[in-house]
Structure formats: structure tokens, C-alpha cells
UniProtKB/Swiss-Prot annotation:
MF-aspect GO terms: rRNA binding; structural constituent of ribosome
Any single Gene Ontology cellular-component annotation: ribosome
Keywords: Ribonucleoprotein, Ribosomal protein, RNA-binding, rRNA-binding
Protein name per Swiss-Prot or TrEMBL: Large ribosomal subunit protein bL20
Cited function: Binds directly to 23S ribosomal RNA and is necessary for the in vitro assembly process of the 50S ribosomal subunit. It is not involved in the protein synthesizing functions of that subunit.
Pfam families, alphabetized: Ribosomal_L20
GO biological process: ribosomal large subunit assembly; translation
Species name: Roseobacter denitrificans (strain ATCC 33942 / OCh 114)
Keyword presence, Ribonucleoprotein: yes
Record CDD domains: Ribosomal_L20 (cd07026)
Domain of life: Bacteria
Keyword DNA damage listed: no
Gene from which this protein is expressed: rplT
Family in the record: Belongs to the bacterial ribosomal protein bL20 family.
Amino acid sequence: MSRTKGGTVTHARHKKVIKAAKGYYGRRKSTFKVARQAVDKANQYATRDRKNRKRNFRALWIQRINAAVRSHDEALTYSRFINGLNLAGIEVDRKVLADLAVHEPEAFGAIVKQAQDALAA
């Protein structure tokens, strides 16, 4: 039986890794062994940061909402505002609230007023 060499398969696998390392600096873009390590580490970072992106955006939305709420009423805090929304039965998520606070301050002010009324009642 003749010997089977894996040249084409190995070449394709190496080429895939080198292609993924395009734009890297030094041997990280051209040498298979180093490129594979760099690509593996990049994939670890990408996986981790897909999770962190969700946390970061939620934190950003909360900061924006808190700043907007305090600009409408100095005494009202973020947590009391969210409590007021729950008491008023307003079910708007933080992403939409932050967008309203930035782009439509008048509408956000009306929501703040409803939350204050619910807290007072």
C-alpha cells in the first residue's frame, strides 16, 4: 500500500490560521506556531468580551439614566426612580430609558414625573 501524506490538509489548516492572523505584528502573522497561539488568545479575548459587552452597556445605560433623573430632580436617585416605574406599572427597559434620556429629554421628563407621582402615592 502506498504512503498517504497529509500535505494538502495540513497546508489548508495552516493557511486558515495564517489568514485569521492577518494584520498581526511580526512573526504572529507569518509563522504557523506563533500565529496559532495568537489566534487562540484572540479568540479567548473575543469570547470573554462578548460577555463583558453586555455588562458594560447595562452599566452605561444605568449611568445615563441616573444622570438624566438627577437633572430633572436633584432628590430623586436611580434606584428610587426604578422603584417608581415599577409602582407606576411602566415596563420600559433600561436601554430604551437611556435612549430616551439622551435623545428625547421631554419624553423622559414625563416618565420621571409619572415615577415621582407613583412614589408619592
